């Protein structure tokens, strides 16, 4: 019960975007990735903004889905989309989804969890998988893991209080 209450408090920004916290719980159950880790990654990647877009390294935070769709229609292949910032150029085609499909929060979190679980298995560890979720470059992995770890630790601290 405490975990649910903490997740609810931590996810108030998510609810503000009209996103159900249940998405993260469901994706966690389906993928085996701890819900706290999914939340930490989403926090680092998008600040829980389901419309967040990264265009070749430049973050954009549209205020609506309509605005996000317009940006995506004009974007190239190197674009990260949504709560989990799924890279369409790498994963969209492999998984058979469009850029606009990735704006669906349920699909985005589920795919992000699926991708992360593949990296965790391939790299034989949670944090190695987290680093690779972000980049194949070791230095970028270390920086990313540090950011996710800080967010993850804050979530765990709230859960344990």
Language model: regions and residue ranges:
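Sec-dependent N-terminal signal peptides
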Residues: 3-13
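Catalytic glycan-binding domains that act on GlcNAc-containing polysaccharides
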Residues: 17-161
């Amino acid at each position: 019960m405490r975990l649910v209450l903490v997740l609810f408090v931590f996810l108030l920004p998510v609810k503000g975007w009209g996103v159900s916290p249940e998405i993260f719980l469901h994706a966690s159950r389906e993928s085996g990735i701890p819900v706290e880790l999914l939340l930490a990654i989403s926090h680092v990647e998008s600040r829980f903004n389901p419309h967040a877009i990264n265009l070749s390294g430049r973050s954009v935070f549209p205020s609506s889905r309509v605005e996000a769709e317009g940006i995506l229609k004009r974007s190239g292949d190197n674009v990260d989309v949504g709560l989990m910032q799924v890279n369409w150029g790498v994963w969209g085609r492999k998984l058979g989804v469009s850029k606009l499909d990735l704006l669906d929060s349920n699909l985005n979190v589920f795919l992000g969890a699926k991708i992360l679980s593949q990296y965790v298995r391939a790299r034989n560890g949670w944090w190695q998988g987290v680093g690779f979720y972000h980049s194949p470059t070791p230095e970028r992995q270390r920086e990313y893991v540090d950011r996710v770890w800080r967010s993850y630790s804050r979530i765990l601290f709230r859960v344990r209080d």
